[in-house]
Swiss-Prot record:
HAMAP family in alphabetical order: UvrB
Role played: The UvrABC repair system catalyzes the recognition and processing of DNA lesions. A damage recognition complex composed of 2 UvrA and 2 UvrB subunits scans DNA for abnormalities. Upon binding of the UvrA(2)B(2) complex to a putative damaged site, the DNA wraps around one UvrB monomer. DNA wrap is dependent on ATP binding by UvrB and probably causes local melting of the DNA helix, facilitating insertion of UvrB beta-hairpin between the DNA strands. Then UvrB probes one DNA strand for the presence of a lesion.
Protein name: UvrABC system protein B
Protein family (similarity comment): Belongs to the UvrB family.
Residue window of motif Beta-hairpin: 89-112
Entry comment, domain topic: The beta-hairpin motif is involved in DNA binding.
Coiled coil, from the record: none
Binding site for ATP: 36-43
Organism: Thermotoga neapolitana (strain ATCC 49049 / DSM 4359 / NBRC 107923 / NS-E)
Assembly: Forms a heterotetramer with UvrA during the search for lesions. Interacts with UvrC in an incision complex.
GO molecular function, one term: ATP binding
Residue intervals of the UVR domain: 622-657
GO cellular component: cytoplasm; excinuclease repair complex
Amino acid sequence: MFKLVSEFEPTGDQPQAIEKLVEGLNRGMRFQTLLGVTGSGKTFTMANVIARVNRPALVISPNKTLAAQLYQEFKTFFPENRVEFFISYYDYYQPEAYIPTKDLYIEKNADINDVIVRMRMSTLKSVRTRRDVIVVASVSCIYATGDPNDFDRMNIKLSVGERLDVFELAEKLAKIGYQRTEDVSLSGCFRIRGDTLEIYPTYQDEGIRVEFFGDEIDAISLIDRFNRTTLERLDKVIIYPAVEFVTTEEKLRRAIESIKEELRERLAELKKQGKVLEYERLKQRTLNDIELLETMGYCPGIENYSRHFDGRKPGEPPYTLLDYFDDDFVVFIDESHITVPQLRAMYNGDRSRKKNLVEYGFRLPSAYDNRPLTFEEFLKKVGQIVFVSATPGDFELSVSEQVVEQIIRPTGLVDPEVEVRPTRGQVDDLINEIVKVKQRGERALVTVLTKKTAELLSEHLTELGIKSLYLHSELDAIERVEVLKKLRRGDVDVVVGVNLLREGLDLPEVSLVAIMDADTEGFLRSETTLIQIIGRTARNVNGKVIMYADRITNAMKRAIEETNRRRRIQLEYNKKHGITPRSIVKPLEIEVFEQFMVKEEPAEYGDTIKNIFSMKESLSLEEYVALLEEEMYRAASELRYEDAAALRDELFRVKETLKKKKGR
């Protein structure tokens, strides 16, 4: 079924890791962890495991950047199989919200990326019709999508000789989301020319031409979308829905009755509570939606009524991509130390935003059920999971029936030496080290604790003739990748930032990582963070890490010990096999953003920082402090360190205000 294509054979630790993981899956182990260091070829190991077990696979990545990277790699490994890409289709997303203190209602505002819509529809079709499928997804795969049973039922089967006329087919297509148009560059549409109807599905590049002779199908062809030439003659074809959410007329009728019933119950509650404004608001908004549903079959914000369309009870989980797979699919959670906390956090972030919408009469309580899965629901919907990380979290390690280590790098590259130097004179010492790196034609990364420090240090380095840029949270994902491309090309010698882990991109030109104030206790200098930062130089033969600190914290001690353990294993392997370490040489490819027009949207993982700060006015200072602390630790657990640092700074300010108030 799966055919893995590669000029390389598994080597180093890869063969034993592949054997153990395959054996674990075949023996029915529910949870396993692949603990693989940076540069050890974890993706190649995953590809080999998938090829060996021959089962559909879902690979979940913590962000779109890494998902797009993995998608490219799996496409290369499996050119003859279906490799699909499933991420949030929003280029920009402002969720619906209400801020009571300002009486401010914010309408949902979104910019949808048509390329990603096509890739999502291609995913749904592939997963429902084939078994040789690998889907690379972001955590948005646990958000609601259409009912897979409707997707199966509402397809249109056509065959040559079938009795059907062109207008009957047009009517059928309209019912599954296709629109009539003359613009053939659009997907999810059809056009009619005489006795010929051309269909342009969302899930494939090719179009389908259906030619009629009276009320009979005379010919079916696969055609080139742009020059409309015939690619292949077909005897029959199946047309799948053009959109994720499709429904039958019977389901629509039942949904409208169910919405009316819920509205009656909710209005009675609001009347009993004496909430006159909320009563009138909800009544007017919902009746308007019902009228649109009855006349058009659609209304803005229709997703908030999804429970009624699906026939779900209150609190029941929505349908997601997971429901489209066969029961035996395998899940790989990449960078699990980041992805698992994200999967845990998404439900609460979504519910807290909707609370005001429901309480103040903007939405019915059923809006709560248009949501991502809880972590417990996610675990119930999947079977076997392989967690993949260089630094697995406590959850992964506690539930895994086996932890498979992949320490050895095929390139022979050794984990960098870690030096601890005093903070006194640290900037001058750092400059000397950067100059040495620059003379070798290599690059450096410097991680600091605050955005202000990053800015000042970067400016200081520039004044001294060292080409420097700093990464900060105001840069969007594309701009951040552009900064790192400049570093790789040599346009920049050093990049300074608070969070240099966010991209997870390969930077083989980097031979020096400097960690300023390494002995500061906190999430920015935890054991996991330090090991991840150290790994940034593990792709260069001259890799070195300098920690500037006046004492050795427990986190530093554990990170250094683990790095030294990995160094020893690799050095022994190199000596035994006569391997001379060599730096990874990686071409500057077309970036995934340019290829897929992928943009990160900060709102994908729950409330944005701005939304959190805006809640200050509707909470007491004590409640606001509790919220800030909770969100700060959540951001830190997801390695969103710039967000965590912004929340920390706000927390300090509010605590200072609270202290002054109590001191009066």
